[in-house]
Amino acid sequence: MRIEEDLKLGFKDVLIRPKRSTLKSRSDVELERQFTFKHSGQTWSGVPIIAANMDTVGTFEMAQALAGFDILTAVHKHYTVEEWAAFINTASADVLKHVMVSTGTSDADFEKTVQILALNPALNFVCIDVANGYSEHFVQFVAKAREAWPTKTICAGNVVTGEMCEELILSGADIVKVGIGPGSVCTTRVKTGVGYPQLSAVIECADAAHGLGGMIVSDGGCTMPGDVAKAFGGGADFVMLGGMLAGHEESGGSVVEENGEKFMLFYGMSSESAMNRHVGGVAKYRAAEGKTVKLPLRGPVGNTARDILGGLRSACTYVGASRLKELTKRTTFIRVQEQENRIFNSL
């Protein structure tokens, strides 16, 4: 046993220090980025935000809607091959370039992903997702996926430390998914005591990944557009959003009505709700590590997407970054004890 004395920070612990700027308007900010990935060699350009691979967020409808904003969607792994085929038949090439195919690490998951990727060559992204990216089996699966799909861009996670980030990149991942426990419907930190404050995880993993020519996606912990800006400021190449995109018309959650008001269910992918739906219940040897919440219906996701992108542009103007790429170089974080004046938040 040992204790690390270094202070670790989450998004709520900091603000971005403003700096002189020559930008006249938020409209001057370029949010699109262009990446060439280490292993796949593929080049992609767009806004580096990803809708999370949760079945109440990462839906085909969400992919259609967010492609119009140049945003990616990691489509959840629970669609059948037939459902994928039907979606591909109606989706444009532009939509497909904004889609990630999500998979687990079982043999059945692998075979299903092989079939999905064979449906259309425009599917260039694979998202290999497990709750605990520290297992040797996971590393071996990433290597197997890289061998099977040498020209596909592979995103793999989740981890929170530099050495494991490096391990996954060296095993074939182009993008490493960073985050254990920060999600709005994740209870891993409560159930297990395991986790890492998200901003510090992003900073440390970005440093490790960029040294090897890899990239990271900050997954979880964003509750408002300012958190997205902080994640990019901390060095994230991509930011993945779950709760911020839940509860919309395109989100795919079940709608319930209480006292004349409609709500949409949103749950973590390790929650009892998710396991009841997909694997017949919580196994006897494990505990649920997610919760289910009811969100007021929020209308079309386009309104929220515009709000997020607008906040991100504004953050860039406050530090003089004319492009999103420049944000991390221009970011100075200050530690704080308050984020906002909350006097009217309950009204």
Swiss-Prot record:
Gene Ontology molecular function: GMP reductase activity; metal ion binding
Catalytic site positions: C186 (thioimidate intermediate)
Binding residues annotated for NADP(+), in chain numbering: 108-131, 216-239
PROSITE patterns referenced in this protein's UniProt entry, alphabetically: IMP_DH_GMP_RED
Protein name in UniProt: GMP reductase
Enzyme Commission identifier(s): 1.7.1.7
Keywords of the record: Metal-binding, NADP, Oxidoreductase, Potassium
Positions with a binding annotation for K(+): G181, G183
Cellular component GO terms, alphabetical: cytosol; GMP reductase complex
Entry superkingdom: Bacteria
